[in-house]
Amino acid sequence: MLSGLVPAVGAAAAPASAPPSSVRAADDPAPGNEGMPDDGFDNESEGEQDDFAGTGTGSAAASDSASTAPGVSALAAPVPGRAADFKLAKSTDISGLVTKLDAALPKQGLTELMEQANRPSKWEGACGTAGIYGSDLAVNHRVCWQSDDATSSEWVPQAITGVSDAQEDEDWGTSNAEPIAVAGYDAENPGRSNYAKDRDNCLQDSASDACNEKGIRVSFFNQATQMYRHVLLVWPYMNSKDHISFDALHASEGKCTTEVTSSCAAQNGIHAGGMVWYGNYLYVADTANGMRVFDLRKIMDLNPDNKADVDDPTPDGLVSNVVDKKRIGRQSNVWYGYGYRYVMPQVATLKFTTAKNGGTTSGNQCYATGRPKASYISLDRTDTDHMVLGEYCNTNNGGTSPGRVGTYPMAELTAAVEGATGTTASADLAYGLPTGATFNNEALWHKIQGVTRYEGKWYFHRSNGYDNGRLLQATPGTVDGASQLVGNAKTLESAFGPEDLYLAHGRGDGFAPQLWSLSEHAPSKCGSCKRELYSYNMGEVISDFG
């Protein structure tokens, strides 16, 4: 047991498998609507960033005049970017909730977490065949997940960041771990519903633990040991018994009024298509809302003695349980984390202030004006540190834009996170993506899954269903007198299922700059699909584009 953490009188540690007593059963219910912030969260489309979503019958908002007909010629000219549309503001202040949770549970630093990484990966040639990669780019590093993560239908990897984003010198803690962090979203659940008679449907003996909407987990990879560890992201709240608790990340509670089934999804998760680790903060893209922010100094440890079969005492006099995979937060005076040892609570929300455009987004349609989508984010350290944020769009289904990108000074974002409710962070630049070029009988410049900006040039990862994606390059220029991104006519074949981008600049460790990404598709999705992390030498990428 962790020294110094002694249970209160009458709260002795118990075997992890012991069921809650009838006395405890009336206390601390399953999380519900009481956990949501006053201003709520908007839902994203179920098929967010899915190349196959939509029917091709999208419609535009009345406020936009551009054509919405599907097809290559629908967007003949780039749309201008409007930086004002990207403005963010700090939402409901939850610092008091985080303080209460901080006092209730023990914590673990990231350096120690890296030393206790428990899941082995494969590295370089041990990953086997490299069939998911195209012929244009030489892959420099490869990392393969443990088999259950490589094949999981529940968890789908999306976003990537690392220590090069976190610190200029790339030196985190006392180890040589040089952590890389990958976020994945829960793709397999109906979740629960407050409005159904069987609100506790996911707790039934017959229910799989995959029933719950677990939200987002982050996997921290130790490059020195090739081991990694999962951390579940959570949302702090006061439950109906006025006790501090936490729930998995989601947008809103569903409103199924009958039995909760897969066709009546109870909860709406978030996609986490992009992530930036900057200093102590982890920024996670929330497509419909903006960004969720987490603090790496607040990683809570539900199993500090590393003995899963024994409940550990917590500073608040209760115990924690990492065996039960169906429960989350404080329930019946026991702390749970869906079986995960580590949970990290959200500390702030940065929400878009601009109203949504009125057009449909069910098929990943995008629009030239109004609130953007936070589909992916990355960090540019070339000059003054900036976050780059962009949209995934599918013009085959309509809309009036192939996507927009904007940049924020990191100093403004940090000030908003640490400031009072309403503190804003404004984009200082915005562009619409290039148009005109074609690929596979459709527009080239859409279906963007990741972006990075490096030494003045922009690099985009374009997906292509269950086939090789493309790495694209664009340069700021002038088109018809307006400042816009001009696409390079050359494209580079990338991996199957390409996702977010992360640039490890190498200024601290002396290595050549690496452009990292990841593939999302499990082998069950297609014959050649495979999940890997991989990097290209950035110098070779630049040279290959000419």
Spell out what each predicted region is.
Residues 166, 185-186, 288, 297, ...:
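Residue-level signature of beta-propeller blades and closely related beta-rich strand-turn architectures
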Residues 152-176, 267-278, 366-386, 444-445, ...:
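Structural signature of eukaryotic scaffold interfaces centered on beta-propeller domains
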Residues 7, 14-150, 534-546:
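Sequence/structural signature of beta-propeller modules
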Residues 145-172, 183-273:
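Blade-loop segments of beta-propeller domains
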Residues 221-225, 295-333, 402-428, 474-483, ...:
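Short loop/turn segments immediately following beta-strands, especially the blade-tip
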Residues 385-500, 506:
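Loop/turn-rich, solvent-exposed surfaces of beta-rich toroidal or solenoidal domains
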Residues 106, 110-153, 225-266, 307-369, ...:
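Surface-exposed loop and turn segments in beta-propeller and other repeat-based domains
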Residues 189-218, 290-296, 396-411, 466-477, ...:
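Structural motif
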